[in-house]
Regions:
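Functional cores that coordinate and move charged inorganic groups
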Residues: 1-100, 128
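Short N-terminal signal/transit or membrane-insertion segments
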Residues: 1-3, 89-105, 188, 192-201, ...
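Short N-terminal helix-initiation segments at or just after the protein's N-terminus
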Residues: 5-7, 119-126, 213-218
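Generic detector of short, locally flexible boundary/turn motifs and exposed helical patches
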Residues: 9-14, 22-28, 109-115, 143-147, ...
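Generic preference for hydrophobic/aromatic residues in regular secondary structure cores
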Residues: 18, 33, 41, 46, ...
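Feature captures C-terminal
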Residues: 38, 43-44, 127, 131-274
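A short C-terminal boundary segment appended to hydrolase-like catalytic domains
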Residues: 62-162, 170, 246-248, 267
């Protein structure tokens, strides 16, 4: 985030910590299969199967022993597609009751959308997609202010009947709704940080409004070029505010009032849903 943290600590370990033959990476959702040379001059295999189980890390290790000691080793790796292996009948039989229970739950109709909503407009301003999350958070929690971000980079819920499974397009993971007591200043500062991660400081109409990477992330040259992850791009509801993208961090956000027109105070404590 914002250049404050190591993006690829696993590669740093492979290159700078002697003693490893293989480093298995994960979490960053970018495929990797290559050998790097560490500071001791040894070869280290680095592998990352990315996400969703589409491929797995497949490694062959051949070791030659002499008098109980390793005299030679050959290490090779490939990313192997899982699709050709098909579905395990034994696995499906074992978990069929649980599968049926989940299918029944996620197939419940819970409403209807009169038009398709997408995360894409959320990066440029108010959007129906994020407004829905804000509305739900405020209504369910009774909070005064809501903070929410597009947790899925590019997704949509199509016009028509809406089912429980569609809600995973809103919030894909097991995130729970919480309320916190925050001062007005803390709300303001949280938004300042969000828009600093989200928006570029524009100096002319030709500048990008979004904060984009100068160079692709290592191992993900084909990825969209946000400098920071979109799930950090929090907007707020329950307040009326403006964002001036020509201003520096700390001066971008101006909170004008609460949504009902009553004054917003920096030193007042507010209940915030997130």
């Amino acid at each position: 985030m914002g250049g404050k943290y190591r993006e690829n600590a696993s590669l740093d370990v492979a290159r700078n910590v002697p003693g490893f033959d293989i480093v298995l990476m994960g979490h960053d959702h970018a495929r990797e299969c290559k050998k790097v040379q560490n500071v001791a001059g040894d070869s280290v295999l680095v592998m990352d199967p990315a996400s969703n189980g589409i491929v797995v890390s497949d490694i062959d290790i051949t070791v030659t022993l002499r008098n109980g000691k390793v005299t030679d080793k050959q290490i090779d790796g490939v990313l192997t597609e899982t699709a050709p292996y098909g579905i395990s009948g034994e696995f499906m039989k074992r978990f069929s009751p649980q599968y049926a229970t989940i299918q029944d739950f996620v197939s419940k109709r819970i409403g209807r959308f009169t038009k398709t909503v997408s995360t894409r407009p959320a990066y440029f301003g108010s959007s129906a997609f994020i407004d829905l999350i804000h509305t739900l958070q405020l209504d369910i929690s009774g909070a005064e202010i809501s903070l929410a971000a597009p947790l899925s980079y590019d997704t949509q819920i199509k016009e028509g009947d809406i089912y429980v499974y569609d809600m995973f397009n809103l919030y894909k993971y097991e995130n729970m709704l919480y309320t916190m007591k925050l001062s007005g200043k803390e709300v303001h500062d949280a938004l300042e940080m969000s828009y600093d991660l989200w928006t570029n400081r524009m100096t002319s109409p030709d500048d990008h409004i979004l904060l984009l990477r100068d160079q692709p992330r290592e191992g993900a040259a084909d990825r969209a070029a946000f400098k920071n992850f979109s799930f950090n791009f929090d907007s707020a509801a329950g307040i009326i505010y403006t964002v001036d993208v020509t201003k520096p961090c700390g001066s971008k956000v101006t909170i004008l009032s609460m949504a009902d027109g009553t004054p917003f105070h920096m030193d007042k404590m507010y209940t915030v849903a997130l």
